[in-house]
C-alpha cells in the first residue's frame, strides 16, 4: 500500500475525504456508494454485537478463558459475572445508542442537496470520529438510570419503529418486483425468451413461498395442538393467495399494466419469511404426555435437546434479517426508488432488458474520474446533486435499529430475558 493511499485513508478517517479502494486491481468507487457502505458496516458491527450479547455460550467462554473475569466485571460495575452486559436489556441499550446515532444524523443532514456543504462533509467523512461517537452512545446507554422505566418505554418505541420498517420493506419489495417485471417485459419485444425467464422466476418464487408454508406446517404444528401456529399459517397463506388474485385482476391490470404474478410472488416470499420469524420467536409450549412427562411441542424436532432448532433458526433468521435490512436501507433511499414508490417510472421505450436490472447499464462519467495510477480513487459524484436523500437514509437506518432490537430479542418483554437466549 503506497504512502499516498495511506494518506488518503487517513484523510477519510479524520477528514472529509471519501473512502476508496487502494488496491490497483480494484475499480474506482463513487463517494455516494462508499459512504453508504461505511454506514452499513457500522450497522453490521452493532448487529453482530447484539447477537453476541444474546449468546449464553459467549458469556460462559469469557468466564472460562479471561483471567480475573469476575474482578473485571465488578470493577466496571457490570455485576459479578457481567450479567448487565448480556441479555435483553443489554441489547435494548446498545440499539438505543445506535438509533440515537442515526437519528442525530437524520436531523443533521436535512435539506442537503449536494456534497459541497459542511454538513455533507460530516456525512461523507470523519469515519474514525463517527465510530467513536457510535461507541460512546452505545456505551452511554448503560448509564441511563431507572432501568425498568426506560426499558418499558423503549420497548414500545421499538415495536412501533419495527412495524414501520416492515412497511418500508414491503413497499420496497413491490417497487423492486415492479422494476424487475417491467425491465424483463421490455425485452420480449426483441426476444421471446424473456417471457420464459419471467415465468421461471415467478414459478420459483411461488415454489419457495408454498414450500416454506408447508415446511412450517409440518415442523411448527401438531395434530391436536399448536392452534395459534395453525391460525397464523392459515391467515398468511390466505393473504398470499388473495394478493395473487388481486395482482392479476382486470381492475389492477387496467390501472397498472405491468402488474403481475411476479410482484405477488416476491411479496409472498417475504411474508413467508416474516411468518417463519414469528414462529421461531414464539416460545415453545410444554405439555404433559400420557406418562406425566414434560413434552415440548410446536417446535421442530431434530432429535437433540429442548431447543434443537435454535442453531438453524438463528443462522437462517440472522442471514435473512441482515440481507433484508441492508437491501432496504441502501436502496430505498435512492431517488429512483423514491420516484418509483410515488408511481413515477421510466418510459417503456427507454427500458433495456438486463439480467442485472438493479444496476445501470453503464457508469456515468464525471470530471472527477482522473486516470491516476495510485492512491485513493474516489469519484465525487454528488457535487451537482445528491444521489440519495441523506436524511431519509439515516431515518431508515434509525427504524432498522429498532427492528433489529425487536427481532434479536424475539419481540419479548425485557423482563423475560432469562426465558430464552440465542445460542
Swiss-Prot record:
Cytoplasmic face of the membrane: 58-89, 146-156, 220-230, 280-311, 407-423
Catalytic activity: a 1,2-diacyl-sn-glycero-3-phospho-L-serine(in) = a 1,2-diacyl-sn-glycero-3-phospho-L-serine(out); a 1,2-diacyl-sn-glycero-3-phosphocholine(in) = a 1,2-diacyl-sn-glycero-3-phosphocholine(out); a 1,2-diacyl-sn-glycero-3-phosphoethanolamine(in) = a 1,2-diacyl-sn-glycero-3-phosphoethanolamine(out)
Stretches assigned to the Extracellular side: 1-36, 111-124, 178-198, 252-258, 333-385
Membrane topology recorded in Swiss-Prot or TrEMBL: Multi-pass membrane protein
GO molecular function: L-serine transmembrane transporter activity; phospholipid scramblase activity
Transmembrane segments: 37-57, 90-110, 125-145, 157-177, 199-219, 231-251, 259-279, 312-332, 386-406
Matches recorded under InterPro entries: TDE1/TMS
Organism superkingdom: Eukaryota
Gene Ontology, cellular component aspect: centrosome; cytosol; extracellular exosome; Golgi apparatus; intracellular membrane-bounded organelle; membrane; myelin sheath; perinuclear region of cytoplasm
Pfam families to which the protein is assigned, alphabetical: Serinc
Tissue: Highly expressed in placenta, skeletal muscle, spleen, thymus, testis and peripheral leukocyte and is expressed weakly in the heart, liver and fetal brain.
Localization in the cell: Cell membrane; Cytoplasm, Perinuclear region
Task performed by this protein: Restriction factor required to restrict infectivity of lentiviruses, such as HIV-1: acts by inhibiting an early step of viral infection. Impairs the penetration of the viral particle into the cytoplasm. Non-ATP-dependent, non-specific lipid transporter for phosphatidylserine, phosphatidylcholine, and phosphatidylethanolamine. Functions as a scramblase that flips lipids in both directions across the membrane. Phospholipid scrambling results in HIV-1 surface exposure of phosphatidylserine and loss of membrane asymmetry, which leads to changes in HIV-1 Env conformation and loss of infectivity.
Protein family according to the UniProt entry: Belongs to the TDE1 family.
Protein name: Serine incorporator 5
Taxonomic source organism: Homo sapiens (Human)
Lineage: Eukaryota, Metazoa, Chordata, Craniata, Vertebrata
